[in-house]
């Protein structure tokens, strides 16, 4: 059992409140998963710039002088430290370079996510503690997703926490269990995708990344997942401009959605949504089995 939440803002006036709203939603789901928690926040992008969220078990060592060491390695960057995580801002053209340099000069650092706009924060612990550790309430953005985990098939670690990201500005949270993830992992490794964990959710994230690399949009990739992924699952997925939800054909994992003129919201239970603005006038529904729900800022523009 896990708790997942998501919030896609249609009204830009709500964007400064994204971190506050999403934090409250996730904390409400604490009793569905007290082992670890995480959030992905899609903030504003800066043309020509990219950012990488990194994590370290020894931040006082790994993050010390990191800006200097990156510059000496030929990759100028700005580093903003937030507890065990840091956001490394670089020129977009240097994204592949910074990955290679980090692996060389900080081998114990792990990449949580990268792209133009996404920042990913996750740790072992209760949602309220993770939210406070990274000051999530102060963060603004256009959309975000969150997860609180009760571990069932892999270790309780920071790397095993959700969201999982395997592509630029792409991430996924999951409630359920996949039965064919080992076979699918082997196929994706042959396609060149690297994995950090044995978690089935990382396989689902990598599957979507691989499908979107073939030219599919998020909605099309989620439709393909209904045929290619076996097991029980509810996915909430984020891309740079999009937000998607899909449940398996049996839909045994709980889910509820709300939509107003100002936002679209997802929660494992309705209580995750009760404090959202104007929730009393929202359209509330349970997502149908084997049905893809997809919203995109670019298509709405």
Curated annotation (Swiss-Prot):
Keyword Transferase: yes
SUPFAM superfamilies reported for this sequence: N-terminal nucleophile aminohydrolases (Ntn hydrolases)
Enzyme Commission no: 2.4.2.-
Active site: 2
Keywords assigned: Glutamine amidotransferase, Transferase
Source organism, top-level taxon: Bacteria
Residue span(s) of domain Glutamine amidotransferase type-2: 2-298
A GO MF term: transferase activity
Transmembrane annotation, as ranges: none
Gene3D superfamilies to which the protein is assigned, alphabetical: Glutamine Phosphoribosylpyrophosphate, subunit 1, domain 1
EC category name: transferase
Protein name as it appears in the record: Glutamine amidotransferase-like protein GlxB
Organism of this sequence: Rhizobium meliloti (strain 1021) (Ensifer meliloti)
């Amino acid at each position: 059992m896990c708790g997942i939440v998501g919030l896609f803002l249609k009204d830009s006036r709500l964007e400064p409140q994204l971190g506050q709203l999403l934090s409250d939603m996730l904390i409400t789901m604490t009793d569905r998963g007290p082992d670890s928690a995480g959030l992905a926040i899609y903030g504003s992008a800066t043309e020509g710039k990219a950012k990488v969220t990194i994590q370290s078990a020894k931040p006082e060592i790994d993050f010390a002088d990191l800006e200097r060491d990156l510059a000496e390695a030929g990759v100028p960057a700005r580093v903003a430290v937030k507890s065990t995580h840091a956001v490394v801002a670089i020129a977009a053209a240097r994204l592949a370079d910074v990955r290679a340099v980090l692996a060389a000069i900080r081998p114990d650092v792990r990449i949580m996510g990268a792209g133009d706009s996404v920042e990913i924060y996750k740790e072992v612990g209760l949602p309220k503690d993770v939210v406070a550790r990274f000051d999530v309430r102060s963060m603004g953005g256009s959309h975000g997703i969150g997860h609180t985990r009760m571990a069932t098939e892999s270790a309780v670690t920071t790397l095993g926490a959700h969201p999982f990201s395997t592509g630029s500005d792409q991430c996924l949270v999951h409630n359920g269990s996949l039965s064919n993830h080992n076979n699918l992992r082997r196929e994706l490794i042959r396609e060149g995708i690297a994995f950090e964990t044995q978690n089935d959710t990382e396989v689902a994230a990598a599957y979507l990344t691989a499908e979107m690399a073939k030219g599919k949009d998020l909605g099309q990739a989620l439709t393909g997942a209904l045929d290619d992924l076996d097991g029980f699952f509810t996915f909430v997925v984020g891309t740079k401009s999009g937000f998607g939800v899909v449940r398996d054909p049996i839909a045994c994992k709980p889910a509820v959605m709300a939509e107003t003129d100002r936002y679209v919201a997802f929660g494992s239970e309705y209580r995750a949504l009760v404090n959202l603005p104007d929730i009393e006038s929202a359209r509330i529904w349970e997502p149908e089995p084997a049905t893809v729900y997809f919203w995109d800022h670019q298509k709405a523009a």
